[in-house]
Each structure stands twice: as structure tokens, then as C-alpha cells.
Amino acid sequence: WTRADIQRRASAALARAAANGVTHLRSHVDWFTADAPDAWQEIARLDTVGITLERVALVPLPLFREPAQAETIARAVANSGERCLLGGFIHSSNWDAAAMENLLCSAARWDLDLDLHIDEELSEVSQGLTWLADHLSRHPFPGHICCSHGCALAAGSDEQAAPILRQLAAHGVTLIALPMTNLLLQDATFGRTPRQRGITLLHEAQAAGVATLLGCDNVQDAFCPAGSYDPLDTLACGLFSAQLSDLFDQQSRLICDRAALTGSPADAAPFAVGATASVVIFPGSDRFIWPLNSAARLVVNHGRLTHRRVWQEEMAHES
């Protein structure tokens, strides 16, 4: 991809997200070496159209194997400005406990929050979350940690998952499920219908006190040719794939809990008297059918109406 191509694609993505009512978006940027890729700088130059945009350096775990290189990567992220996080792609195919140790230590030294792409597999022997839970019990992390995917939790037993979830809750770790991507890619074999859903343990995590969110990890890329930048699509997918209930009153937090994403107490109360409002109004919906049949909307960002999507008329014709 060229820089111009990155600009075009990313700008279109931000415009679509803003029109859907997104005000805070976090993007994983693939790093293939210890040096920042072109996309890292190009995304920083984007007009974010009123969206708070965070960049995560998604680095394959083996690149943290050498402590000096781990420091180089963490320093580069820390020197990239505000709203940058250190991340890692952690899978049984690249597992390295020493690299995990270096990843967490370098993030702590450079005062970076972590966003870990971890255990995206249906393997009972994946070690990412198991190792992290054990490590945190002995070495608390000073910043905030998000763990996305965590599909492997659904492949093991409840007895295996329970102590992991207790440790994640105790250390304020947020667990993010990606229902569209997980349904598409997990238990996938060409010509065979999948048997497993591949969604992490949302209900069990919530019961254990773990902060939970839903996200959309891939939109029209090499891993997922479809998708959208509409959080309501993600929530609707989660409704069916994870059998969620109380969508409007309770589980709507899965797509709008900024504090769960950032770990910042300042984000815990987005509505305050005198503050500028950032809300999405669904004029053709109600709490019983939402998030389905809710495409029409009014987007108010920081007190200003920025987008309006309405149905002018719905016609019924007799045959």
C-alpha cells in the first residue's frame, strides 16, 4: 500500500464511523519490524472528523524477545505523541514467555497502556491469558490493559477460566470480544460448516466483575471482507452470537463504555450538567427493537448536530 492509499482508506473509515455516531475509535496498526510502519505516521496525520483516535502498535510477540529491541519499540510508541498504546499479537504459534515479560516491563517503563491481541484461537493450551493472569498476581501493572479476542477461554473448561477471570477483574483488565471477526474466522475450514462460535466468555467475565466491551477488529480487510464502522451492527451480532439480554438497559454499555476502554476514572461519567452533549438519537426506534431497525439517527458531537440519517418514506404496494 502507498501512503496515499492509506490516507484514502483510513479517511473513508473515519467518515463512516463519524456518521454512525462514533466519537472514540482505537485502531490496531500492524508493525512488522522494530521500526514504525508508514501507516503509523499516516494515521497520525488524518483529519479525525471529531473522533478521538487512538493508535495501537500491534507488534508480533517475537519482536519483544530481545530486551533492547523491546525498549526500542516502546520508546518509539511513547515518543509518538498522545493517544498511543503498546500492543502485541500473542498466539500459541509465537508464544514466548520471556517476550511477554519484556513487553510488559517496557510498557511500564515508558508509561504506556497496553492493548493485547491475545489468544485468538480455539486452543485449550494457549498460554497468553493464563500467563498474564499469573504475572499480574505477582507483578501488578501500573497502567491499563485491554485484552481483545480471548477466544481460547471458550475452548477450555469453566474451571480453567474462572481463576483467569478473577485475576483480570482484580487488576482492572478489560476483555473485548470481536463477534463479527470471531464468528467468521474461528473453527473455519473450507467447505465445512463451523461448529463453534469462537466468542470469548462474556457472561462469565461480567459475572466475575471483568469490564467487557464489544469491538469490530476487521472491516473490509484481508481477514474480513465485510463489516462496518457501526457499533450497532457489532452489538446486534453480539446479541445473537453471545445470546445477550437486556440490550438497551444493560448491554448497550458494551459499545459505549469509554472508561472500560481507557481505564480512566475521568471517562466513567460522560454526562454532567453543563458539559457539551455527545449523543446519538434514534428517532425511528425504541428500547424493544433497538439495535435492530435503527439505521436512522441523529448524531450530536460535543453539542453540535454533525450527521442526520432519516428515512423519508416507507412505501407499501399491493401486488
What are these regions (language model features)?
Residues W1-H28, A34-T48, T72-A78:
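Alpha-helical scaffold segments that flank or form the walls of functional sites
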Residues G21, L86, H117, C147, ...:
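Divalent metal-coordination and catalytic microenvironments
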Residues P37-R55, D111-L116, A205:
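Alpha-helix-loop-beta-strand connector modules within alpha/beta enzyme cores
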Residues D134-H144, Q196-F282:
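His/Asp/Glu-enriched, well-ordered alpha-helical/loop segment
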Residues R253-I255, F271-S319:
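C-terminal cap of metal-dependent C-N hydrolases
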Residues E54, L58-P67, A78-R197:
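Active-site core of metal-dependent hydrolases
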